[in-house]
Amino acid sequence: MDQPHALLVASPGLGHLIPILELGNRLSSVLNIHVTILAVTSGSSSPTETEAIHAAAARTICQITEIPSVDVDNLVEPDATIFTKMVVKMRAMKPAVRDAVKLMKRKPTVMIVDFLGTELMSVADDVGMTAKYVYVPTHAWFLAVMVYLPVLDTVVEGEYVDIKEPLKIPGCKPVGPKELMETMLDRSGQQYKECVRAGLEVPMSDGVLVNTWEELQGNTLAALREDEELSRVMKVPVYPIGPIVRTNQHVDKPNSIFEWLDEQRERSVVFVCLGSGGTLTFEQTVELALGLELSGQRFVWVLRRPASYLGAISSDDEQVSASLPEGFLDRTRGVGIVVTQWAPQVEILSHRSIGGFLSHCGWSSALESLTKGVPIIAWPLYAEQWMNATLLTEEIGVAVRTSELPSERVIGREEVASLVRKIMAEEDEEGQKIRAKAEEVRVSSERAWSKDGSSYNSLFEWAKRCYLVP
């Protein structure tokens, strides 16, 4: 009898590729099924993207096939957002994905797409697959907002940002103006319309896999299943199978970061990393540096060249270091280290000396921190990170955050220092509660994936439903 075969399709960009790769690894290793990942590349021949795919192929038990994306410049407005371009790319990839599936010797029976690829679900019907699912690599609150967005679109007048009251999501935490995703800020824009369309298409799947777990978001998951209004919109089963995060990779060669961390006290270092797209303005970089210095805490800072906050530009050491305050590196020598190249985030967060994480709050990064019991200083920059920061601080209680969004004003050095001390200083009462909660979440994350844990059982419930396991 042939081994069951699942097909996963990853949208362009590392932020979408990595969660799909990790999901594929989990499905293959836990369920003992064959997994093929179609990785739609960005089309920019990015060395980082290519390296990530090749590295993943080397360590994964999944089969990975790259599909170059098509040029869609003639299909979008000149000022189209990155989100819009990616959605249009995925729409245009339908023939290529269909052809790739038809060429497979071992036919997949189940297709899984991400939120950007919901239009590809029709391919599953075209080629005779038995089931099609959507994977949401972020949390249940995000899923609830997305599937309820078409309802909001019909009942709310005007721009959401102009409404003083938070948007009500049945059975869930309301969404305030400061939590709105960028895609929701302009209702006349194409990216908003694409979000509404996807919100309608998600319930047309056979179910949704979401990267959270019952103990973390039980109330929101219950609302998706049981709330009279929200469950009527959701329509299909929701399977919480998280946390699914990158696992530790052994660092073979000597690494100055870990040599330095080995010399530090347990839980005494704050790790600062704002993600692959986390570049700051020059002024904000200076204030963050001086705030770290003022805090008196030890730090590891992964720093990128200042740009607009959506810059995502890396550069060489000299250019990055030139953006720091004069004398900063000399004054903090021995207290902190500044890293200007890629750094192994999961391995750093796993180190015993790390006691806090100043993060952009991408959900993958947040989970990497929470599964290690490391509390977070929330520094949201874009996309759904504003929602994530609120969830981490107000709902889960494992983070502190800036008084205003960093995208709206420069966060001063005094506030930076205060936030760092709150998480790192042993005597801070609020920090003690946050650290205790972070440890509680770490334990619950391990429990969720233990045998007969909530996520373990949820995955097997899904696999049985689509005949991937007996």
From Swiss-Prot:
One term of GO molecular function: UDP-glycosyltransferase activity
DNA repair found in the keyword field: no
Record: residues binding UDP-alpha-D-glucose: 276, 343-345, 360-368, 382-385
Disulfide bridges in this chain: none
SUPFAM superfamilies, A to Z: UDP-Glycosyltransferase/glycogen phosphorylase
Membrane-spanning parts: none
Alphabetic keyword roster: Glycosyltransferase, Transferase
The enzyme's E.C. designation: 2.4.1.-
PANTHER family in the record: GLYCOSYLTRANSFERASE-RELATED, UDP-GLYCOSYLTRANSFERASE 72E1
Recorded family membership: Belongs to the UDP-glycosyltransferase family.
Name assigned to this protein: UDP-glycosyltransferase 72D1
Gene from which the chain derives: UGT72D1
